[in-house]
Each structure stands twice: as structure tokens, then as C-alpha cells.
Amino acid sequence: MSSSKPSFSDYFGKLGGIPMYKKFIEQFHNVEEFEARPDDLVIVTYPKSGTTWLSEIICMIYNNGDVEKCKEDVIFNRVPYLECSTEHVMKGVKQLNEMASPRIVKSHLPVKLLPVSFWEKNCKIIYLSRNAKDVVVSYYFLILMVTAIPDPDSFQDFVEKFMDGEVPYGSWFEHTKSWWEKSKNPQVLFLFYEDMKENIRKEVMKLLEFLGRKASDELVDKIIKHTSFQEMKNNPSTNYTTLPDEVMNQKVSPFMRKGDVGDWKNHFTVALNEKFDMHYEQQMKGSTLKFRTKI
């Protein structure tokens, strides 16, 4: 573990029993008191599930496919990260309070921690899920490149923490299952990352319908082209390269690394995969939620 990085206990606390960045916990009263507006749209994901991809697609929809409009500012200003509270760059609640409607809100919060005002105002919520094995790989590389976060001892060590729910935002299993239950609400749209990779046109059409927007071939084509992985990886307004190395060191790992389905096969050993599968089966027993780990 790098001596320049703090320990896990220095950096993380618990919020409602869920591991969370201490800086976020200190300001969480502002999140709890957040005043939603009826036309707010909330994008919720467990970390590393395609949040930035979905956010950019929504920005393109809101701007009627105007690429230049979407490039005018970085994604974390256009879609503020609700519970994030950092000294210099992202202050989610403050950004959102100063923003004109309609607002697009990003959050990684589980159901029980999302501000109640979003439910009271009957806001539309989109939850994007991704298979757990690809999430844990992507999450591991994020932890390595975010300078302030303590490094895990190894990939295996991080997978163990992930299975135990001892990573920021807690258990992937509980997070995903609780939002799956909430998707019975017609105001909640539940999407799968794997479906988006397999047939992005179909999923964009689904988003347009959910948002009550008119679809045209021209608009959908523009959205698909602008939000392809390669386009977004090369786009400074979406790839987080505007952040200094002291925040995200992209020399360690790029923020937009691969975006593939099935990359977990390059990182899991046979033994670790068997252990993960057993744990997965226990955690997901009784759930109707099914994921694909390859397409």
C-alpha cells in the first residue's frame, strides 16, 4: 500500500451502516434536506456501472442532439453529483441549488439514503445496473487512480471487501436489489449496462419514451455517435482529464478504461471466480433480478 495514501479508516466512515467517504458524511445533512423539483431527473447507479455514459446520453436528449452544447462544460457540472462534497471541484447540493430547471442529478445512493423529496415530488429516476464482476474490476481501478483513496492490498483483497460490502456505497447486492424493487414504480426506469452495450439504439429509444421525448432517426444517430466509448474517452468534457493528478491520476489508470462486458475474465482467478459465484448465489437467492456476464 502506498505510504502517501491514508488508511481506509482515515478516509471512510459509516452512514446508515453503509461505508461512505467521511467528507460526504460531514455534509450529508444538506443532502437529506435537499429540495427536489418536480421536473428533476435523477440518474442512480452503483459506482462504475456506466454513470457517465448514461449522463451524457441524457444530456444529449435534453439538448436535442446538440453536441457543441454538451461540450460547453464538463459532465460533473452539467450533471452534479448530489452527495459529493469536495473542497475544490464538486459540491453537489450547492451546484444543484444554483441550477436552473430542468436539472439532471447524479447519485450513487441506495434507496434508503436518497432524499425523500425526490419521492414526494414524484421525480423520474433512472437506475443503471451492471453485472457485479465487471463492476468490481472497474471499481478496483478507480480506487487505484483516485489519489486520496487508500489502495487495497491486491485485487483479491478488494474483491473480498466488495463481497462483504466494505467498499464505498456498501453492498452491490443490497443496492441493486433495493432499486430493482423500486422499479415497480412507473417513475423508475431500471436499465442494464449489458443491454446498452448490445443494442444501444433500443435503449436510447426506451429512454426517449420514458422522458416523453420525440424520437427521430437523426437524433438517435447523433446520440449514439457522440456517446460511443471512444468518443467519450477522447472528449475532455466527459473523460475527467480536466481534474488534476492530485484528484484523479490517469497515469495510474484512465477514468474511461475499457467499458467492455466480460473484462472480469482477465482479472479473476478460477478459485476467486468460484468463491464469488458461491457468494453471489447466496446473496441473490430469491431475487428475480438476472444479469449477464457476457454478451
Curated annotation (Swiss-Prot):
Induction data: By progesterone.
Keyword RNA-binding applies: no
InterPro entries per record: P-loop_NTPase, Sulfotransferase_dom
Keyword Cytoplasm: yes
Residues involved in 3'-phosphoadenylyl sulfate binding: 48-53, 130, 138, 193, 227-232, 257-259
Subunit text: Homodimer.
Name of the molecule in the record: Sulfotransferase 1E1
